[in-house]
Regions:
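Active-site acidic/histidine clusters and adjacent loop/turn architecture
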Residues: 40-76
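Alpha-helix termini
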Residues: 76-77, 146
């Protein structure tokens, strides 16, 4: 009977996860968080930002950029950690504070959303198809893991606060994605 179950399991196709590879905090040299506040899950809102700086071209420069953002948030803003849950470059997803932790990305929404920042200035540059695909896969992954509600709502930061973020080009592309909320 055991042989039959093993043979049957080997014949069934493996379910592929939507989860993209995520560059973990240790890999980009994250400093220790000064405090962690957990969120209730599943989270109902996703808010997309851009960092407004240069776009990073290599994994090494992207890691350095993410570490610099964390340093700025902890030192200049006096936050407990990097404000974003995740950051996306043209090639990779970087873990900010990660799933089920409250960020510091948009006042009034931090306790009911996750914040995803695209590295670069998307008032000047267009997001790559790969980076948009990484966002879609990350969000689907969040649903699969139970971190995001099945009916989560997707926003650009400019819809909820007076800001240009996530930049006009990224904002236009977000409107083509599932779960987009016109508001």
């Amino acid at each position: 009977l055991l042989h039959i179950l093993v043979a049957r399991a080997q014949d069934e196709p493996a379910q592929e996860s939507a989860c993209p590879a995520i560059v973990k905090r240790a890999a980009w040299g994250a400093a220790k968080s000064k405090n962690v506040t957990y969120q209730l899950k599943p989270v109902a809102n996703v808010i997309v930002h851009h960092t407004t700086g240069e776009r990073c071209a290599t994994v090494a420069t992207c890691k350095e950029m993410v570490a610099n953002i964390q340093t700025y948030h902890q030192t200049d803003n006096r936050w407990s950690d990097i404000g974003y849950n995740f950051l996306i470059s043209g090639q990779n997803v970087y873990e900010g504070i990660g799933w089920h932790r409250m960020g510091a990305h948009l006042r009034g929404y931090n306790d009911k959303s996750i914040g995803v920042a695209f590295l670069g200035n998307f008032d000047q540059e267009r997001p790559t198809p790969r980076s948009l695909n990484l966002l879609a896969r990350l969000l689907q992954c969040g649903v699969e893991l139970g971190e995001l509600a099945d009916d989560y709502r997707l926003y650009g930061a400019r819809q909820l606060q007076s800001t240009n973020s996530p930049g006009r080009y990224l904002y236009a592309k977000l409107q083509e994605l599932d779960h987009w909320q016109a508001q």
